[in-house]
Amino acid sequence: MRNTFIVCWQYLRAFALIYLCLLAGNAVSALLPFTIPGSIIGMLVLFTLLASQILPAQWVKPGCYLLIRHMALLFVPIGVGVMNYYDLVNQQFGPIVVSCLISTFIVMLVVGFSTQIMQRERATAGDRTPPKDNE
C-alpha cells in the first residue's frame, strides 16, 4: 500500500511541476509585447530548470515517460480539429508543403554544420596529448 502511495506521489509531483512550468510560460507569454506560445515558453522554463539542476530530473521523469508513451493518442484531437478547417488547408496546401520542405532543409543544414563543428572541436581536443615524462 505504501508503494502505491509513493508511485502516485511521484506521478502527481511530475504532472504538477510540468503544469506549473506551463502556467509560468502562459504568464510570461501574456506579458510579452509579441506573440510566442505559452507552451513553448513553458518548455523553455522547464528546460532551464532541468539544465541548471534546480529541478531534479527524477522529479519529472515519471510524468514525461507517461506522456511520451501515449503521445500518438494525444495527437488525435489535434488531427480531428484540423479537419474542421479542411477547405482552408486544401486551399493553402501548396504553401504548407513548401514551408515544411524549406524548414526541413534548414534544420538538416543547421544540424549538419553543427555536427561538423562539434566533430572538428572534438578532433582538435583529442589531438592534445599530455607530454610524456622521460624517465
UniProtKB/Swiss-Prot annotation:
It comes from Pectobacterium atrosepticum (strain SCRI 1043 / ATCC BAA-672). The chain crosses the membrane at residues 5-25, 30-50, 63-83, 93-113. Its main location: membrane. It is a multi-pass membrane protein. Belongs to the UPF0299 family. One of its GO terms (cellular component) is plasma membrane. It is found in: Cell inner membrane. Keywords: Cell inner membrane, Cell membrane, Membrane, Transmembrane, Transmembrane helix. This is UPF0299 membrane protein ECA2828. InterPro entries: LrgA/CidA, Uncharacterised_UPF0299. It comes from the Bacteria.
